Amino acid sequence: MASSYKMSEQSTISEHILQKTCDHLILTDRSGLKAESAAEEMKQTAENQGNTVHWAALLIFAVIIPTIGGNILVILAVSLEKRLQYATNYFLMSLAVADLLVGLFVMPIALLTIMFEATWPLPLALCPAWLFLDVLFSTASIMHLCAISLDRYIAIKKPIQANQCNSRTTAFVKITVVWLISIGIAIPVPIKGIEADVVNAHNITCELTKDRFGSFMLFGSLAAFFAPLTIMIVTYFLTIHALRKKAYLVRNRPPQRLTRWTVSTVLQREDSSFSSPEKMVMLDGSHKDKILPNSTDETLMRRMSSAGKKPAQTISNEQRASKVLGIVFLFFLLMWCPFFITNVTLALCDSCNQTTLKTLLQIFVWVGYVSSGVNPLIYTLFNKTFREAFGRYITCNYQATKSVKVLRKCSSTLYFGNSMVENSKFFTKHGIRNGINPAMYQSPVRLRSSTIQSSSIILLNTFLTENDGDKVEDQVSYI
C-alpha cells in the first residue's frame, strides 16, 4: 500500500508538472499572439501617420504655395508698374501683404498641427503668438475688402470730394486705420493667453477654448466678420444703384454744345501754319516735324466726338469694376461664412456636440485660408495690366512697360483748369510768348485764316490726349 501510495503520489506529481507545463505553453502561445497583435497595431499606426504626412504635403502644394506666390506677384505689380500706382491699388497691395503673411506664418504652423494630430509641436510660448497672428491677418484681409467697398462707394457717390482726398498719403492713412482696427480685434488673444497644463505640457492643443475664450469667439466673430459683411453688402448694392442711375443720366442727357471748350485768350494769337511740312513747336518747347492735313475741321470734330464718349466709358469701367468686386465678395462669403457660423454656434450652443463642431472648425478654417489665395487669381483673370505684369514676373522680367503718352507731361502743367497766370508761367519757362515761339513767328496777315484753328488744335489735342490717358487709367484700376 505504501508502494501503491508512492506510485500514486508520483503519478499525481507528474500530472501536476505536466499540467503546469501545458499552462506555460498556452500562456507563451497567447503572449506570442499578443506580441504579434501589438506589432500589427504599430504597423497600422505607422501607415496612418504616413497617410497624414502625405495629405499635409498635398495641402502645401495646393494651398500654401499658390497663396505665397500669387500675393508676391500682386505686391511686385503695384510696386513696379507705374500704371498701377494709384490710391485704390495701394489697398490691394496692403491686402496682398495680409494674405501673404497668412501664407507665411499661419498656414505652415496650422499644417504642423495636422501632421502631429492637433498636438502643438512648437514651444508653448509660441502658441498665443500664433493664435494672435492668425486672428490678426485673417481679420486684416476681411477689413481690407470692407474698406475697398466703402472707398468705391464714396468715389462714385461723391466723386469731387473723393478726388480731392484721393492721394497716396490719404490712402496710407486709411490703410493704417484698417490695420489698427484689426490689431484691436485680435489683441485679447495674447493678453488673455492660453490655459496650459504643466503636467501634460507636451500634449497641449493650441486652440481657443470655449471656457476661456467663449465671449471672444462670439464678439470677435461679430466684429471681424458679420459687421464688415453687412457693410460690404449694403455698400455693394448702393454702388450698383448709383452706377445704374449715372448710366441712365448719361444715356438720356441732351447733346451738349462744346462752347465751354473755347480756346483761352492766351493762345488766340497768331501761330505758324501747319498746312505745309515744317517744324512744329511742341508744348514742351521741343520741335517736331509734322504735317497736319488740310481737313483739320474733320479731325477736330472727330476728336471732340471721342471726348464726348468719356463719361459713358467711365461708367462702363466703373460697372466692370463693381462686377469684379462682386466676384471677390462672393468668394469671400463662400470661404469665410462656414467658419464663422460654426464658431458662433460653438460659443452659443451648449447642447451641441463639441467634438463635431471642433472638427468642422479645423476643416472650415482651411477653407477660409483659401480666400487668401483666391484674390490674386481674380485680379489675374479680370485685369489685363495685372495679367501682363504677372506673365513678365514669372519669366523674371521685372522691367515695367513704358506707356505711350506723348503730350501727357505738358498736360499736367497746361490745361483748361489752370489759371492764366500758371499758363503764362509755363510759356515763359519754355520760351514761348503768347503761345508762340518767337523763332517761328510769321506775319499775322498771312496766317489770319488759320490762326485760331491751328492753336485750337494744339490745345485740344493736349486736352483730348489727357482724356485718353484718363481712359487708360480707368481701365487699369478695376477695384
Curated annotation (Swiss-Prot):
Lipid-substituted positions (S-palmitoyl cysteine): C396
InterPro entries found in the cross-reference section: 5HT2B_rcpt (IPR000482), 5HT_rcpt (IPR002231), GPCR_Rhodpsn (IPR000276), GPCR_Rhodpsn_7TM (IPR017452)
Taxonomy, superkingdom: Eukaryota
Secretion signal span: none
TM regions (residue ranges): 56-78, 90-112, 129-150, 171-191, 216-238, 324-344, 360-381
Motif range (PDZ-binding): 477-479
Site feature (Hydrophobic barrier that decreases the speed of ligand binding and dissociation) residues: L208
Compartments in which it is found: Cell membrane; Synapse, Synaptosome
Record motif [DE]RFG motif, residues: 211-214
Motif NPxxY motif: where in chain: 375-379
Keywords noted in UniProt: Behavior, Cell membrane, Disulfide bond, G-protein coupled receptor, Glycoprotein, Lipoprotein, Membrane, Palmitate, Receptor, Synapse, Synaptosome, Transducer, Transmembrane, Transmembrane helix
GO molecular function, one term: G-protein alpha-subunit binding
Topology class, membrane: Multi-pass membrane protein
List of residues binding ergotamine: D134, T139, L208
Residue ranges that the UniProt entry lists as topological domain Extracellular: 1-55, 113-128, 192-215, 345-359
Main location: membrane
GO cellular component, as recorded: cytoplasm; dendrite; G protein-coupled serotonin receptor complex; neuronal cell body; plasma membrane; synapse
Single Gene Ontology BP annotation: release of sequestered calcium ion into cytosol
Tissue specificity field: Stomach fundus.
Function: G-protein coupled receptor for 5-hydroxytryptamine (serotonin). Also functions as a receptor for various ergot alkaloid derivatives and psychoactive substances. Ligand binding causes a conformation change that triggers signaling via guanine nucleotide-binding proteins (G proteins) and modulates the activity of downstream effectors.
Family as reported in the entry's similarity comment: Belongs to the G-protein coupled receptor 1 family.
Subunit structure: Interacts (via C-terminus) with MPDZ.
Entry domain remark: Ligands are bound in a hydrophobic pocket formed by the transmembrane helices.
Protein name: 5-hydroxytryptamine receptor 2B
Organism, as annotated: Rattus norvegicus
Lineage of origin: Eukaryota, Metazoa, Chordata, Craniata, Vertebrata
